[in-house]
Amino acid sequence: MELSENKEKFFYLGYLLLLESLDKIQEDGQTGAKTLLAKASSLGFYTIVDLVSAQLGDYKNIVVPSLPEVDLLFLNEYEASALLGDHIIENDVQSLLQAAQSILNLGVRDYVILHSSYGAVAVSSAGETAVQGSVLMTEDLIKGAAGAGDAFAAGVILGMHTSKSMKSCLKMGVCSAASCLMDSSTSKGVMNMDKCLNLGDQYGFRSLE
C-alpha cells in the first residue's frame, strides 16, 4: 500500500514487539517502526500504536524511540509496567493515571490510553484526563478474553472517528470489549456499537477509583 495515495484519517500500527522487520534497529539507531510512523505523520495521518503482552521485549530500544511519532498509544497495565519498570495496580485509578502520564512524558504526542480488566484511563498532552470503568459482565456471560483489547481499541477509534468526547470513546471501548468476552473466539462476540452500548446500560459499569 502506498501511503501517499491513501486519504484515511488514522494510521494504526499493531503490534510493536511482534513485527520483526519494523522492530529491527537500523544502522542509524532508529527502528523501522519509527521510520514508518514518521512517514505516516508527514502525510497527515493521525498515528495510533498498540502494544502486545505476549511478547514483552526490549521496550527501551524498540518502543520508546517510536513514541515521538505516535499520536495515540494503547497499552494495558502489563505493558505499561514493562515500559516503565514499575508495578501498576490495575484497579487503582491513580496508579493507572500516573503510569499513563509517565508514558505520555516519554514523547507520545496526544493521548495515552491505559486499559485493564477494571476499565480504562486516558491522559492527553493538553492536560485532559478521562476515566471509564469496565462493564460488570456476569461470569456466566464470559466465554473468553482473547481479542478484548483489540475490540476495546476499535471502539475507541470509532468514537474518535465520529468526533466523540474521550470519555465517550472510552465507554465505547469498554462496551465493545465486553461484547467480545461473550464468545471464545477473538471477534465473533463483537456486535454493532448500539448493541455494545446496551451491555453497559444493562449490566452497569465498575467504579474505577
Task: Specify the residue positions occupied by each region the protein language model found.
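Alpha-helix N-cap/helix-start capping motif
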Residues: 77-78, 150
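Conserved post-catalytic alpha-helical subdomain immediately downstream of the catalytic base
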Residues: 106-108, 136-209
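Ribokinase/PfkB-type carbohydrate-kinase core domain
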Residues: 1-72, 78-130, 135, 186-209
